[in-house]
Amino acid sequence: MNSTSTIIEFTGEFWTYFTLVFMMLTIGFFFIVTSLVAAILNKLCDLNDHHTNSLDIRTKLRSDTQLITRAHEESINQSSN
């Protein structure tokens, strides 16, 4: 019985195309990953700004309420004198 084998020769041209395709796939992969990370960070920054702004609004409302209460107390004190 004769044994048959297949010989694959990797010529210089094969390695050139292999390297080119591998490089393109690697660059594409990093581009996709970078885009996803940028989108996630952008979304997180938007959420953080929303919470920061809502906290500022609550703080502003709280200080406005305190100012109104103090003004009301002063008017009561003036009317009682």
From Swiss-Prot:
Known role: Viroporin that forms a homopentameric ion channel displaying low ion selectivity. May play a role in virus morphogenesis and pathogenicity at various stages of the viral life cycle. Accumulates at the membrane of the Golgi apparatus in infected cells and may facilitate virus release by modifying the secretory pathway. May enhance host membrane permeability and disrupt cellular ion homeostasis, which can be sensed as damage-associated molecular patterns/danger signals, triggering NLRP3 inflammasome activation and inflammatory immune response.
GO biological process: proton transmembrane transport
Activity regulation behaviour: Channel activity is inhibited by copper. Also inhibited by small-molecule pyronin B.
Homology family: Belongs to the orthopneumovirus small hydrophobic protein family.
InterPro entries: SHP (IPR005327)
Intravirion-facing ranges: 1-19
Residue numbers on the Virion surface membrane side: 41-81
Official protein name in the record: Small hydrophobic protein
Modification after translation, per record: Four species of SH have been detected in infected cell cytoplasm: a 7.5 kDa non-glycosylated form (SH0), a 13-15 kDa form that contains one or two N-linked carbohydrate side chains of the high-mannose type (SHg), a 21-30 kDa polylactosaminoglycan-modified form of the protein (SHp), and the isoform generated by alternative translational initiation. Of these different forms, SH0 is by far the most abundant protein detected during virus infection. Tyrosine phosphorylated.
Membrane topology: Single-pass type II membrane protein
Transmembrane regions listed in the UniProt entry: 20-40
Pfam families: SHP
Glycan attachment points: N77
Keywords: Glycoprotein, Host cell membrane, Host endoplasmic reticulum, Host Golgi apparatus, Host membrane, Hydrogen ion transport, Ion transport, Membrane, Phosphoprotein, Signal-anchor, Transmembrane, Transmembrane helix, Transport, Virion
Broad class of the protein's primary localization: virion
Subunit structure: Homopentamer forming a funnel-like pore. Interacts with glycoprotein G; this interaction occurs on the surface of virion particles and infected cells. Interacts with host BCAP31 (via C-terminus); this interaction is direct.
Organism this protein belongs to: Bovine respiratory syncytial virus (strain 391-2) (BRS)
Organism domain of life: Viruses
Localization, UniProt: Virion membrane; Host cell membrane; Host Golgi apparatus membrane; Host endoplasmic reticulum membrane
Cellular component terms (Gene Ontology): host cell endoplasmic reticulum membrane; host cell Golgi membrane; host cell plasma membrane; membrane; virion membrane
Disulfide-bonded cysteines: none
